[in-house]
Amino acid sequence: MPTYRSKTSTAGRNMAGARSLWRATGMKDDDFSKPIIAVVNSFTQFVPGHVHLKDLGQLVAREIEAAGGVAKEFNTIAVDDGIAMGHDGMLYSLPSRDIIADSVEYMVNAHCADAMVCISNCDKITPGMLMAAMRLNIPVIFVSGGPMEAGKTRLANPVTKAIEVKKLDLVDAMVIAVDPSYSDAEVAEVERSACPTCGSCSGMFTANSMNCLTEALGLSLPGNGTVVATHADREQLFKRAGRRIVELTRQHYEQDDERVLPRSVGFKAFENAMTLDIAMGGSTNTILHLLAIAQEAGIDFTMKDIDRLSRVVPQLCKVAPNTNKYHIEDVHRAGGIMAILGELDRAGKLHTDVPTVHTPSLKDALDQWDIVRTQDDAVRTFYQAGPAGVPTQVAFSQNTRWPSLDLDRAEGCIRSYEHAFSKEGGLAVLTGNIALDGCVVKTAGVDESILVFEGTAHVTESQDEAVENILNDKVKAGDVVIVRYEGPKGGPGMQEMLYPTSYIKSKGLGKACALLTDGRFSGGTSGLSIGHCSPEAAAGGAIGLVRDGDKIRIDIPNRTINVLVSDEELARRREEQNAKGWKPAQPRPRKVSAALKAYAKLVMSADKGAVRDLSLLDD
């Protein structure tokens, strides 16, 4: 029977000093016999996805205490990728994932907490906390701050000129801002309307993708990924999480039940999470994060597994940025993540014998929460929770209900296998002589006309250079824009390339160009945008051998990407590059801090999840 970790600092005469300090935090005599549960919050006023979390940690804490536990809250950092985008601030985004994981480990182990509730939301915070959860392997429940409501405004149709109500998100503001066909007044209106409420950005971007994946991993409650941040129903998720974590903690320490530990989810749950991601056309960043989380869990889940799944899993859901028709609030109306998992189950694409934090198995969860099969009217009412359309930074501030559910599995937001958007899913892994260890593309955002594309290399050696060339019309139709030395080591920090892809789209080249990088993309990216090219240029990857004018062939159906240069020529170029060193041809005006240099020393390429190479720490 495992011993409560907290007893290390609360039991025995020799811990009198520690207990004295615990008492100074408000603990009483009878509290020392209770489990100590960490409430891991990520409140910050810098990030709209986290601006409303300040009081929610204490909301969870009160429920923990009412259920018989002791709650102790602390905070992690949180970087807003959208605000950090397009300047050197983005160098810090991916490294912050590891800082978050480390900070959770430090706090929980230093204070011997028995379990934790992780309150996350945006891009690197959920993955960082998931990495920590797997590393610590103590009972945990995730509850996110929830998605933002989609924005709305009235704009003239660029073709018909008729005034239309248009749903908006962050990416629309970026694209329209550099489109000369829109007036300054229209750009200002979109800017003010695109992000109307607190919450994670409203499309199937990285933050929402990861919060949805926690449901598939079995580590959060149904609705975690899809109930909008402003809706009163989300308050119940926080309260239930607080009560449930006490039950899970007792199951582990008092009943020796290892099924409640995060590592118990196993390989099958990682397959389920990736299957969901492919089916819903999630962010390519989720691949990076799942690989990293699997490494922390000690699970051998690799790019080969992702490639295998991408060939057999259908795309059942298409949401912004892959379409303007649907946002996360529409996914919820169609039954949320449990509905997508239900359709995958009926298609024979899911492992349902894995545990969740709220049911003994995923099968039990689907029986209760899949709106196609449930008999529970309360569940149906839950999935009618909708947006109010009122700008606010206040959580749980409205109780709007959709008049009906979206149960149309032929033409609705969520499709059945028979009516899938495509029989192959929304993500693909490509390999070839330019990416020996693979690269990834969100096929859900690629127009069918360019699934096979042959173009001319336009080489840039930083995101800044790529943006400058695109805006100055140096990039032409038929080009493959190469953005290299932006990987985890080469950046350092593996910047997101949302600005280059948005500007390509705004220049009318979205169906006429491709972009290939050893960096990564925002979840808001669409188009023929291929990232995570591994090995990266700074690690000797072949993307560093490409030259202006080389022909590059991309074949998504056959999962290949190649520079059309002979092996002999590539070998000659490699010898030349070895002599020069694997770095940009010209020094970049980029200030790299000591913290980023330390990160670059240990980090591996994207195909390994951009985690630290721990072998470098061996004696």
From Swiss-Prot:
It catalyses: (2R)-2,3-dihydroxy-3-methylbutanoate = 3-methyl-2-oxobutanoate + H2O; (2R,3R)-2,3-dihydroxy-3-methylpentanoate = (S)-3-methyl-2-oxopentanoate + H2O. GO terms for cellular component: cytosol. One of its GO terms (biological process) is isoleucine biosynthetic process. GO terms for molecular function: 2 iron, 2 sulfur cluster binding; dihydroxy-acid dehydratase activity; magnesium ion binding. The modification N6-carboxylysine is found at residue 124. Its EC number is 4.2.1.9. It comes from the Bacteria. Pathway: Amino-acid biosynthesis; L-isoleucine biosynthesis; L-isoleucine from 2-oxobutanoate: step 3/4; Amino-acid biosynthesis; L-valine biosynthesis; L-valine from pyruvate: step 3/4. Mg(2+) binds at residues 81, 123-124, 496. The keyword Nucleotidyltransferase does not apply. [2Fe-2S] cluster binds at residues 122, 201. Keywords: 2Fe-2S, Amino-acid biosynthesis, Branched-chain amino acid biosynthesis, Iron, Iron-sulfur, Lyase, Magnesium, Metal-binding. Its cofactor is [2Fe-2S] cluster; Mg(2+). The keyword Iron-sulfur applies. The active site is at residue 522. Binds 1 [2Fe-2S] cluster per subunit. This cluster acts as a Lewis acid cofactor. Homodimer. Functions in the biosynthesis of branched-chain amino acids. Catalyzes the dehydration of (2R,3R)-2,3-dihydroxy-3-methylpentanoate (2,3-dihydroxy-3-methylvalerate) into 2-oxo-3-methylpentanoate (2-oxo-3-methylvalerate) and of (2R)-2,3-dihydroxy-3-methylbutanoate (2,3-dihydroxyisovalerate) into 2-oxo-3-methylbutanoate (2-oxoisovalerate), the penultimate precursor to L-isoleucine and L-valine, respectively. Belongs to the IlvD/Edd family. This is Dihydroxy-acid dehydratase 1. It comes from Burkholderia lata (strain ATCC 17760 / DSM 23089 / LMG 22485 / NCIMB 9086 / R18194 / 383).
